[in-house]
Amino acid sequence: RLNNHHVLLITTTVVMLYTAASNALNDALDYEIDLINRPERPIPLGYVSIKGALFISFLLFAFGVALCLQLPDMAIVIGVFISLPLMVTYSTNLKGKYLIGNMVVSFLLGASFLFVGVSHEMTSPMLIPMLLAFGLTFLREIIKDVADIEGDLSLGLKTYPIISGVDSYRRIII
């Protein structure tokens, strides 16, 4: 059995590896959008190839899974069987879906608190941070959708500001 320091190190590392892997995957798949919205990113600038980003994503996810398998069973369920598939599905299918992508990203950030709590067998203290992370991340994701509206429109994404309008978005934020 791992002591608390090892569990904390493993859970923190898994969250970092998964986040980096998911970002690399998203960058590889968002290449065309980033040409418009974020042309200063490494892939549009040609510093990193799409294949290179996909390879890095795969490696980071694999290392994250390997570490996750050392944790208690419920943490493995959250890390390997819930969070990992959601991260990949978000990047491949859900990103531009009306509010669904925003909810998935928000859930994933909130779930990281649950993941740590389950790993330490102390879930209750993590419920409030989990809910706060979900709510604040959801607002942040909608704000990001407005900032990315030009590129998202050009590729036919169905984000909240595109479907409901920027005025509707402003009412939610305020």
Region annotations inferred by a language model:
Residues 3-4, 23-26, 37, 93, ...:
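Detector for Asparagine
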Residues 43-128:
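Intramembrane alpha-helical segments
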Residues 27-34, 97-105, 122-129, 146-153:
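A cytosolic-side transmembrane-helix exit/cap motif
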Residues 14-63, 135-174:
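Solvent-exposed interhelical
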Residues 3, 36-37, 79, 97, ...:
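Non-catalytic, surface-exposed connector residues within folded enzymatic/regulatory domains
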Residues 2-29, 61-65, 76-88, 123-143:
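Membrane-embedded alpha-helical segments that form the functional core of polytopic membrane enzymes
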